[in-house]
Amino acid sequence: MTLPVYSRADLSRIAILVALFLTAISTSVVAREFRAADTQSEDYPTVQALRYMGRVIAERSDDRLQIRVFHSRQLGEEKETIEQTRVGAIDLNRTNVALIGSFVPAMNVLAMPFLFRSIEHLEKVLDGPIGNEILSSFEPYGFVGLAFYDSGARSIYNSVRPIHSIADMKGLRLRVQQSELMSDMIRALGAEPIELPYGQVLTGLATKLIDGAENNWPSFVTTDHYKHAGYYTLTEHTMSPEVLVMSQKAWQSLSADDRQIFRDAAIQSSQFMRAKWKDLEERSRRQAEAAGVKIVTDFDRKPFEDAMAGIYAKAQRDPATAALIERIRKVE
């Protein structure tokens, strides 16, 4: 039997191919994929931020750790994905504080109406000791809080009439998040709250199941709600942020070094997201104006704030909640 004779160049090429093959096998064995959920569309700033975070984590872990982002409600509506994250079926989740407040009580404070004076006030709270304390409060409930994302200011829009006073709210059927706090707020303003999953709002507007809803500029425009609701009143009643959480199950499986990689990447993604958000917010408002949406800025704000007295009285029965609200108000 005659054995094949290989040249030095052939042997070199074979060695390279074997090395690449072994590297591929090694990578496939040690690489781990984390599933991240976001109900927003693919080009939304929070989805882009999750992908940015994934790139940072992959780079810092030499591709051992990978994030796969599921957007556009691919893993379910937001409340469903929160529950899946709590039990460990989803590893990472971007969610609004009003929804996760059903699981983590401290988050309801950030969703309180008319609590923040401005976006700058909000960011000072989130970036400081209070924000860190709130993120730490997730752990007893099956989550690990990693970072806050911006969500702008939520305002009320509808298809029936411009809202200049609280009297104009009477009788309007307004979609709210699946949150007791949000339902109480709309009811206190004289309207009828209709709890609907985010993905059903457009159909609800088109079929007149609801008269309107409340959300920020990008959500109003990117979902095409502006095509069915021609009045947008700058109530800016809440400035509740988004929050990025990880399941306790996934977190406990990480080494101390890898946990730090995730924390650092999450903070970086928050800054990345804020820049993307501010640009989209401006473009969304211009698009709504160009489409003929009537933007109401001259509404009587004080009666709206006064109507929240009962909501605050209920929340402040808990001494810890009352103290947190007071601390937030004192941040300059």
Residue ranges and their predicted role:
Residues 26-32:
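Bacterial Sec-dependent signal peptides at the C-terminal "C-region" and cleavage site
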Residues 2-16:
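Bacterial N-terminal signal peptides that target proteins for export
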Residues 13-26:
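Bacterial N-terminal signal peptides
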Residues 32-121, 129-131, 136-332:
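N-terminal secretory/targeting leader peptides
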